[in-house]
C-alpha cells in the first residue's frame, strides 16, 4: 500500500518528464517551439571595433567607477593600517647588539 501512494505522488513528474522528452525529439526533427526572446542583441557586435555604448551605460559606468574609487580612497585615508600594516616600524636605535647578533666587545 505504501508503495502505491508513492507512485501516485510521482505520477505528475513522470507526465512532465514525458513532455520534455517529446519536446526534445520534436525540436530535433525540425519543429519550432515557442521562442521567448526579445529580438536580436541589444547592441550588435562589431568586428575589431569598440562597442557602441548607450548614454545610460556610460552614466552607470561613471557612477560605479566613482563609487569604487571613493570607497578605496576613503578606506585608505581612514584605515591605512589595513594596507600599510598594523604595527609601527620598530626604532633601530632601540635594538641591542645581542638582538642583532653582534658579539660583545670584550671577546677577542
UniProtKB/Swiss-Prot annotation:
The gene is NDUFB2. This is NADH dehydrogenase [ubiquinone] 1 beta subcomplex subunit 2, mitochondrial. It is found in: Mitochondrion inner membrane. Complex I is composed of 45 different subunits. Keywords: Electron transport, Membrane, Mitochondrion, Mitochondrion inner membrane, Respiratory chain, Transit peptide, Transport. Belongs to the complex I NDUFB2 subunit family. Residues 96-108 have a biased composition (Acidic residues). Accessory subunit of the mitochondrial membrane respiratory chain NADH dehydrogenase (Complex I), that is believed not to be involved in catalysis. Complex I functions in the transfer of electrons from NADH to the respiratory chain. The immediate electron acceptor for the enzyme is believed to be ubiquinone. Its main location: mitochondrion. GO terms for cellular component: mitochondrial inner membrane; mitochondrion; respiratory chain complex I. Residues 1-36 form a transit peptide. It is a peripheral membrane protein. InterPro entries: NDUFB2_animal.
